[in-house]
Protein backbone atom coordinates (compact mmCIF):
# COMPACT_ATOMS: atom_id res chain seq x y z
CA UNK A 1 0.00 0.00 0.00
CA UNK A 2 2.82 2.36 0.89
CA UNK A 3 5.48 1.17 -1.58
CA UNK A 4 4.22 2.71 -4.82
CA UNK A 5 5.09 6.34 -4.11
CA UNK A 6 7.76 8.21 -2.19
CA UNK A 7 7.47 6.76 1.32
CA UNK A 8 6.38 9.85 3.24
CA UNK A 9 4.17 11.13 0.42
CA UNK A 10 2.31 7.83 0.41
CA UNK A 11 1.50 8.31 4.10
CA UNK A 12 0.32 11.84 3.35
CA UNK A 13 -1.92 10.50 0.58
CA UNK A 14 -3.55 8.01 2.96
CA UNK A 15 -4.23 10.66 5.56
CA UNK A 16 -5.95 12.75 2.90
CA UNK A 17 -8.31 9.88 2.03
CA UNK A 18 -9.73 9.28 5.51
CA UNK A 19 -13.54 9.06 5.54
CA UNK A 20 -15.81 11.41 7.51
CA UNK A 21 -18.27 10.52 10.25
CA UNK A 22 -21.93 9.77 9.54
CA UNK A 23 -23.87 12.87 10.52
CA UNK A 24 -27.10 10.98 9.85
CA UNK A 25 -26.23 8.34 12.47
CA UNK A 26 -25.19 11.04 14.94
CA UNK A 27 -28.46 12.91 14.43
CA UNK A 28 -30.45 9.72 14.94
CA UNK A 29 -28.52 9.01 18.14
CA UNK A 30 -29.24 12.51 19.45
CA UNK A 31 -32.91 12.09 18.59
CA UNK A 32 -33.01 8.89 20.64
CA UNK A 33 -31.27 10.66 23.52
CA UNK A 34 -34.03 13.26 23.50
CA UNK A 35 -36.64 10.51 24.01
CA UNK A 36 -34.96 8.65 26.87
CA UNK A 37 -36.37 8.81 30.39
CA UNK A 38 -34.23 11.68 31.65
CA UNK A 39 -34.05 15.44 31.26
CA UNK A 40 -32.29 16.33 28.03
CA UNK A 41 -28.56 16.71 28.54
CA UNK A 42 -28.67 15.37 32.09
CA UNK A 43 -26.12 12.64 31.32
CA UNK A 44 -23.65 15.26 30.15
CA UNK A 45 -20.70 13.89 28.25
CA UNK A 46 -22.14 10.38 28.30
CA UNK A 47 -24.67 11.60 25.75
CA UNK A 48 -21.93 13.16 23.63
CA UNK A 49 -19.91 9.94 23.74
CA UNK A 50 -22.87 7.86 22.57
CA UNK A 51 -23.52 10.19 19.63
CA UNK A 52 -19.79 10.24 18.82
CA UNK A 53 -19.63 6.44 18.69
CA UNK A 54 -22.79 6.32 16.59
CA UNK A 55 -21.33 8.76 14.09
CA UNK A 56 -18.21 6.66 13.53
CA UNK A 57 -19.85 3.25 13.66
CA UNK A 58 -22.50 4.54 11.28
CA UNK A 59 -25.51 3.36 13.29
CA UNK A 60 -27.87 5.13 15.72
CA UNK A 61 -27.25 2.60 18.49
CA UNK A 62 -23.51 2.01 18.85
CA UNK A 63 -22.05 -1.24 20.15
CA UNK A 64 -19.03 -1.94 22.31
CA UNK A 65 -18.44 -5.68 22.14
CA UNK A 66 -14.77 -5.88 21.10
CA UNK A 67 -12.72 -3.03 22.54
CA UNK A 68 -8.97 -3.49 22.12
CA UNK A 69 -5.87 -1.95 23.65
CA UNK A 70 -2.95 -2.06 21.20
CA UNK A 71 0.42 -1.35 22.82
CA UNK A 72 3.40 -0.62 20.56
CA UNK A 73 6.88 -0.98 22.06
CA UNK A 74 10.22 0.31 20.80
CA UNK A 75 13.65 1.49 21.94
CA UNK A 76 15.43 4.76 21.23
CA UNK A 77 19.05 5.58 20.48
CA UNK A 78 18.83 8.88 22.34
CA UNK A 79 18.78 6.91 25.61
CA UNK A 80 22.57 6.70 25.20
CA UNK A 81 22.64 10.39 26.15
CA UNK A 82 21.48 9.57 29.68
CA UNK A 83 17.97 10.96 29.32
CA UNK A 84 16.11 8.18 31.14
CA UNK A 85 15.98 6.80 34.67
CA UNK A 86 15.92 3.24 33.27
CA UNK A 87 18.01 1.25 30.76
CA UNK A 88 16.56 0.10 27.40
CA UNK A 89 16.46 -3.49 28.68
CA UNK A 90 13.41 -2.53 30.72
CA UNK A 91 11.35 -2.31 27.52
CA UNK A 92 11.86 -6.03 26.80
CA UNK A 93 11.36 -6.93 30.45
CA UNK A 94 8.01 -5.16 30.35
CA UNK A 95 7.06 -7.12 27.23
CA UNK A 96 7.58 -10.28 29.25
CA UNK A 97 5.55 -8.79 32.09
CA UNK A 98 2.69 -8.02 29.70
CA UNK A 99 2.81 -11.60 28.39
CA UNK A 100 2.76 -12.97 31.94
CA UNK A 101 -0.21 -10.80 32.86
CA UNK A 102 1.67 -8.87 35.52
CA UNK A 103 1.41 -5.27 34.33
CA UNK A 104 -1.13 -2.62 35.27
CA UNK A 105 -2.62 -2.71 31.78
CA UNK A 106 -3.38 -6.43 32.15
CA UNK A 107 -5.39 -5.74 35.29
CA UNK A 108 -7.27 -2.78 33.83
CA UNK A 109 -8.14 -4.67 30.65
CA UNK A 110 -9.34 -7.62 32.72
CA UNK A 111 -11.48 -5.39 34.91
CA UNK A 112 -13.28 -3.81 31.95
CA UNK A 113 -13.37 -6.72 29.49
CA UNK A 114 -10.92 -5.17 27.03
CA UNK A 115 -8.68 -7.17 24.70
CA UNK A 116 -4.93 -6.54 24.79
CA UNK A 117 -2.34 -6.94 22.05
CA UNK A 118 1.30 -5.92 22.41
CA UNK A 119 3.56 -5.35 19.41
CA UNK A 120 7.36 -5.36 19.66
CA UNK A 121 9.17 -3.18 17.13
CA UNK A 122 12.78 -4.35 16.77
CA UNK A 123 13.66 -3.81 20.42
CA UNK A 124 17.23 -4.99 19.90
CA UNK A 125 17.81 -2.36 17.20
CA UNK A 126 17.06 1.06 18.71
CA UNK A 127 16.35 3.95 16.40
CA UNK A 128 19.26 6.28 15.73
CA UNK A 129 20.20 8.95 18.27
CA UNK A 130 18.10 11.98 17.28
CA UNK A 131 20.74 14.36 18.62
CA UNK A 132 23.12 13.14 15.90
CA UNK A 133 21.02 11.95 12.93
CA UNK A 134 17.44 11.15 11.90
CA UNK A 135 15.78 8.46 13.99
CA UNK A 136 14.69 6.51 10.90
CA UNK A 137 15.05 6.37 7.15
CA UNK A 138 11.96 7.34 5.16
CA UNK A 139 11.37 3.77 3.97
CA UNK A 140 11.62 2.46 7.54
CA UNK A 141 9.18 5.10 8.73
CA UNK A 142 6.67 4.13 6.06
CA UNK A 143 7.10 0.41 6.71
CA UNK A 144 6.54 0.89 10.44
CA UNK A 145 3.49 3.07 9.77
CA UNK A 146 2.16 0.26 7.55
CA UNK A 147 2.82 -2.30 10.28
CA UNK A 148 0.73 -0.22 12.66
CA UNK A 149 -2.08 -0.14 10.11
CA UNK A 150 -2.01 -3.90 9.66
CA UNK A 151 -2.00 -4.53 13.41
CA UNK A 152 -5.67 -3.54 13.66
CA UNK A 153 -7.80 -6.59 12.94
CA UNK A 154 -11.33 -6.37 11.62
CA UNK A 155 -14.08 -6.77 14.19
CA UNK A 156 -12.66 -4.34 16.73
CA UNK A 157 -15.29 -1.72 17.60
CA UNK A 158 -13.13 0.58 19.77
CA UNK A 159 -9.34 0.97 19.64
CA UNK A 160 -7.29 2.20 22.59
CA UNK A 161 -3.75 3.15 21.60
CA UNK A 162 -0.86 2.69 24.03
CA UNK A 163 2.94 2.49 24.08
CA UNK A 164 5.98 1.26 25.94
CA UNK A 165 9.53 2.41 25.36
CA UNK A 166 12.37 3.68 27.50
CA UNK A 167 13.25 7.16 26.25
CA UNK A 168 10.02 7.81 24.42
CA UNK A 169 8.99 10.83 26.48
CA UNK A 170 12.19 12.44 25.19
CA UNK A 171 11.25 11.91 21.56
CA UNK A 172 7.66 12.98 22.30
CA UNK A 173 8.94 16.23 23.81
CA UNK A 174 11.11 16.81 20.74
CA UNK A 175 8.09 16.27 18.49
CA UNK A 176 5.96 18.75 20.42
CA UNK A 177 8.79 21.29 20.48
CA UNK A 178 9.23 20.93 16.71
CA UNK A 179 5.50 21.21 15.99
CA UNK A 180 4.49 23.87 18.49
CA UNK A 181 7.59 25.94 19.23
CA UNK A 182 8.27 27.70 22.50
CA UNK A 183 11.24 26.21 24.33
CA UNK A 184 12.29 22.69 25.20
CA UNK A 185 11.38 23.43 28.81
CA UNK A 186 7.75 23.88 27.77
CA UNK A 187 7.53 20.23 26.66
CA UNK A 188 10.09 18.23 28.65
CA UNK A 189 8.87 16.48 31.79
CA UNK A 190 10.13 13.88 34.23
CA UNK A 191 8.88 10.92 32.20
CA UNK A 192 9.59 7.72 34.13
CA UNK A 193 11.19 9.69 36.95
CA UNK A 194 14.28 11.59 35.77
CA UNK A 195 15.46 14.48 37.89
CA UNK A 196 18.52 16.59 38.51
CA UNK A 197 21.33 16.09 36.00
CA UNK A 198 19.38 13.48 34.05
CA UNK A 199 16.53 15.94 33.54
CA UNK A 200 19.04 18.55 32.37
CA UNK A 201 20.48 16.03 29.90
CA UNK A 202 16.98 15.29 28.64
CA UNK A 203 16.33 18.99 28.12
CA UNK A 204 19.64 19.42 26.31
CA UNK A 205 18.97 16.41 24.08
CA UNK A 206 15.63 17.83 22.98
CA UNK A 207 17.18 21.24 22.28
CA UNK A 208 20.05 19.69 20.32
CA UNK A 209 17.84 17.37 18.29
CA UNK A 210 15.39 20.05 17.22
CA UNK A 211 18.21 22.46 16.34
CA UNK A 212 19.95 19.79 14.25
CA UNK A 213 16.88 18.87 12.22
CA UNK A 214 15.19 22.29 12.12
CA UNK A 215 15.67 22.88 8.34
CA UNK A 216 13.42 19.87 7.66
CA UNK A 217 10.78 20.26 10.37
CA UNK A 218 8.19 22.22 8.40
CA UNK A 219 6.89 18.82 7.23
CA UNK A 220 5.17 16.94 10.09
CA UNK A 221 6.08 13.59 8.55
CA UNK A 222 9.73 14.60 8.58
CA UNK A 223 9.24 15.45 12.25
CA UNK A 224 8.05 11.88 12.80
CA UNK A 225 10.92 10.40 10.81
CA UNK A 226 13.70 12.50 12.28
CA UNK A 227 12.59 12.96 15.88
CA UNK A 228 10.18 10.10 16.50
CA UNK A 229 10.47 6.37 16.98
CA UNK A 230 9.03 3.14 15.68
CA UNK A 231 6.19 3.13 18.18
CA UNK A 232 5.31 6.70 17.16
CA UNK A 233 5.07 5.71 13.48
CA UNK A 234 3.19 2.50 14.26
CA UNK A 235 0.67 4.28 16.49
CA UNK A 236 0.08 6.86 13.77
CA UNK A 237 -0.57 4.01 11.35
CA UNK A 238 -2.98 2.34 13.76
CA UNK A 239 -4.94 5.56 14.22
CA UNK A 240 -5.27 5.97 10.45
CA UNK A 241 -6.22 2.30 9.97
CA UNK A 242 -8.97 2.67 12.55
CA UNK A 243 -10.34 5.68 10.69
CA UNK A 244 -10.37 3.73 7.41
CA UNK A 245 -12.43 1.01 9.14
CA UNK A 246 -14.76 3.46 10.95
CA UNK A 247 -13.38 2.39 14.33
CA UNK A 248 -13.41 5.10 17.01
CA UNK A 249 -10.12 5.56 18.88
CA UNK A 250 -9.26 6.41 22.48
CA UNK A 251 -5.88 8.08 22.83
CA UNK A 252 -3.81 7.40 25.93
CA UNK A 253 -1.36 9.96 27.27
CA UNK A 254 1.63 12.12 26.44
CA UNK A 255 3.55 9.80 24.08
CA UNK A 256 0.48 8.54 22.21
CA UNK A 257 -0.48 12.15 21.61
CA UNK A 258 2.88 12.73 19.91
CA UNK A 259 1.79 10.30 17.20
CA UNK A 260 -1.64 11.92 17.12
CA UNK A 261 -0.10 15.40 16.87
CA UNK A 262 1.81 14.38 13.74
CA UNK A 263 -1.44 13.37 12.03
CA UNK A 264 -3.20 16.50 13.25
CA UNK A 265 -0.40 18.66 11.85
CA UNK A 266 -0.83 17.01 8.44
CA UNK A 267 -4.65 17.32 8.45
CA UNK A 268 -6.68 19.08 11.16
CA UNK A 269 -9.52 16.56 10.70
CA UNK A 270 -7.26 13.52 11.13
CA UNK A 271 -8.25 13.01 14.77
CA UNK A 272 -11.98 13.58 14.43
CA UNK A 273 -12.56 9.90 15.28
CA UNK A 274 -10.46 10.11 18.47
CA UNK A 275 -11.30 10.72 22.11
CA UNK A 276 -8.71 11.66 24.74
CA UNK A 277 -8.90 8.96 27.39
CA UNK A 278 -7.28 10.95 30.18
CA UNK A 279 -5.11 13.87 31.19
CA UNK A 280 -1.62 12.65 31.97
CA UNK A 281 0.37 14.00 34.90
CA UNK A 282 3.22 14.62 32.43
CA UNK A 283 3.06 18.40 32.62
CA UNK A 284 2.76 19.42 28.98
CA UNK A 285 -0.02 16.96 28.15
CA UNK A 286 -2.77 19.43 28.95
CA UNK A 287 -1.36 21.96 26.49
CA UNK A 288 -1.00 19.24 23.85
CA UNK A 289 -4.66 18.25 24.27
CA UNK A 290 -5.68 21.89 24.00
CA UNK A 291 -3.85 22.19 20.70
CA UNK A 292 -5.45 18.96 19.48
CA UNK A 293 -8.89 20.21 20.50
CA UNK A 294 -9.51 17.29 22.86
CA UNK A 295 -11.10 17.32 26.33
CA UNK A 296 -9.94 14.33 28.40
CA UNK A 297 -12.50 11.92 29.80
CA UNK A 298 -10.54 11.25 33.00
CA UNK A 299 -8.03 13.08 35.19
CA UNK A 300 -6.52 10.67 37.69
CA UNK A 301 -2.96 11.96 37.98
CA UNK A 302 -1.61 9.01 35.98
CA UNK A 303 1.57 8.97 33.90
CA UNK A 304 2.16 5.25 33.35
CA UNK A 305 1.60 4.81 29.64
CA UNK A 306 0.82 1.28 28.40
CA UNK A 307 -2.60 2.50 27.23
CA UNK A 308 -3.69 2.47 30.86
CA UNK A 309 -5.61 5.76 30.87
CA UNK A 310 -7.35 4.91 27.61
CA UNK A 311 -8.33 1.47 28.93
CA UNK A 312 -9.77 2.99 32.10
CA UNK A 313 -11.90 5.29 29.95
CA UNK A 314 -13.49 2.23 28.33
CA UNK A 315 -15.51 1.68 31.49
CA UNK A 316 -16.99 5.15 31.15
CA UNK A 317 -17.61 4.63 27.42
CA UNK A 318 -19.33 1.31 28.12
CA UNK A 319 -21.63 3.12 30.55
CA UNK A 320 -22.45 5.67 27.85
CA UNK A 321 -23.38 2.90 25.40
CA UNK A 322 -25.39 1.02 28.03
CA UNK A 323 -27.45 4.10 28.88
CA UNK A 324 -27.99 4.94 25.23
CA UNK A 325 -29.11 1.47 24.18
CA UNK A 326 -30.68 0.14 27.37
CA UNK A 327 -32.70 3.02 28.78
CA UNK A 328 -36.39 3.16 27.99
CA UNK A 329 -37.95 6.03 26.09
CA UNK A 330 -40.73 8.07 27.69
CA UNK A 331 -43.22 6.25 25.48
CA UNK A 332 -41.89 2.78 26.32
CA UNK A 333 -41.90 3.49 30.05
CA UNK A 334 -45.22 5.35 29.88
CA UNK A 335 -43.60 8.27 31.67
CA UNK A 336 -44.81 11.78 30.93
CA UNK A 337 -42.31 13.97 29.14
CA UNK A 338 -41.48 17.60 29.85
CA UNK A 339 -44.46 19.95 29.82
CA UNK A 340 -44.59 23.70 29.42
CA UNK A 341 -41.50 25.86 29.96
Swiss-Prot record:
The active site is at residue 306. Catalyzes the synthesis of alpha-ribazole-5'-phosphate from nicotinate mononucleotide (NAMN) and 5,6-dimethylbenzimidazole (DMB). It comes from the Bacteria. This is Nicotinate-nucleotide--dimethylbenzimidazole phosphoribosyltransferase. HAMAP family: CobT. Its EC number is 2.4.2.21. Pathway: Nucleoside biosynthesis; alpha-ribazole biosynthesis; alpha-ribazole from 5,6-dimethylbenzimidazole: step 1/2. Keywords: Cobalamin biosynthesis, Glycosyltransferase, Transferase. Belongs to the CobT family. InterPro entries: Nict_dMeBzImd_PRibTrfase (IPR003200), Nict_dMeBzImd_PRibTrfase_bact (IPR017846), Nict_dMeBzImd_PRibTrfase_N (IPR023195), Nict_dMeBzImd_PRibTrfase_sf (IPR036087). GO terms for molecular function: nicotinate-nucleotide-dimethylbenzimidazole phosphoribosyltransferase activity. It catalyses: 5,6-dimethylbenzimidazole + nicotinate beta-D-ribonucleotide = alpha-ribazole 5'-phosphate + nicotinate + H(+). One of its GO terms (biological process) is cobalamin biosynthetic process. The gene is cobT.
